[in-house]
Amino acid sequence: SFILFTLHDFLLLNDNDDAPQKVFADVESRLDDLSANPLDQVGIPTGFSRYDFAIGGGLRKGTVNVIGARPKTGKTLFAENAGIYIAHKLGIPVLNLDTEMMLQDHQDRGIAMLTEVAINDIETGKFADNSYKNQKSRDVAKQVKDIPYYHKSIGGKPFEDQLSIMRRWLAKEVGLNAEGKANDCVIVYDYLKIMEAADVKGDLKEYQLLGFLMTSLHNFAIRYEVPVLAFVQLNRDGINKESTDTASGSDRIVWLCSNFSIYKSKSDEEIAKDGPENGNRKLVPVISRHGEGLADKDYININMIGKYGKIVEGQTAFELEDGTDYSEKLENGNDDIPFA
C-alpha cells in the first residue's frame, strides 16, 4: 500500500494539466500579445452595437449569451438578423439551430431582410411581377450564395443528438486548432426547450431539465471555446417583469450564462414617450458578467419591421431623454458612459 501511495503521489506531482497555475506568472507575455494584436472589442459583433457594448464587447469565446422573449415577439427574427450579419459582413461561420422553422423559412426571411422586399412577396413568388424587386432579389441571392451561414432544424431531436450535430459542424465546416478548440464561429440556438419524452427522466420537472440542457450547452461552449447566442421562452411573468426569474428554468440558466437579456414588445406608454420612430420593441440587458449592462430602467430601443423580417437597433431610452449618443461617450472615456 505504501508503494501504491507513493506511485499515486508521483503521478499527481507530474500531472501538469490539472495543476493550479500562478495567476500572474505569464501576464507580461499576455500583455505583449494583447498590445501587439489590438482589438476593437473582445467578442464577435452581433450587428447590434449597444447590445454588444452592454454585454462586454460582443459574443466572447466560451460563453452562452441568453436572450429571453415571450412567444411571437420576434426572437427568431433577432436570431436571423444577428446570424446573417456575422456570416455576411464578417465572414465568420454561423450555425443556426432552429427548433421550429424549416430551411425555406430562413431563406425567404433572409432575402426579405437583405432586400427589403416583403416576406409575403418572396414566399408567394409575387416579387417576380415587379422588375425592380425581381432584380434586387436575384442580385442579393448571388451575393449571399456562399456566405458561411448554416441552418439545421433540430425540432424533436434529443439534446445529445443536437450536441453531435454541433461537434460535426465544428470539425467539418469551422475547423479545430491543435488544442481541439474551434476557430472563430458562432452557434445560434433558437430556442432552449424540452423536445420529447426521451429527454424527460424520472420525476424531474421541466425547469430542472432545462437546467441540465443549459449545463450541457455551457460545457460545450467552454470545451470548444465557442460563443453561443441562445434564446429562451419567458414565462408569463415576463409580460410585465424584467428580471432573471422570468426565464423558464431560470436559476440554472442565469447561473451559467455570461449575460441575460429580455427582448419584448414596448408598451403603448413607452412608444408614446420614446416616439413611434424609435421602435416597437425593447432589449433589456438584465445581467452581464463581462459588460457594464444598462442603468436601472434603461433599455435599448429596437424597431422590428416584420414585413421585411428586419431588426434595427436604436438609441437607449436614456440617450433619447438626455439627447446623447453612447458612441460619443465612448470616445471621451468610460466615466460618462450612461451604462452602469
Each language-model region and where it sits:
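Core recognition of P-loop NTPase motor domains used across DNA-transaction enzymes
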Residues: 1-61, 142-145, 220, 293-295, ...
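Glycine-rich nucleotide-phosphate-binding loops and adjacent flexible coil segments
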Residues: 48, 53-231, 237-239, 245
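Intrinsically disordered, low-complexity regions enriched in small/polar residues
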Residues: 4-14, 21, 26, 129, ...
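C-terminal regions of RecA-like/P-loop NTPase motor modules
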Residues: 25, 116, 120-127, 141-144, ...
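A broad, low-specificity signal marking well-ordered, structured residues that form hydrophobic/aromatic
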Residues: 46-49, 65, 149, 283, ...
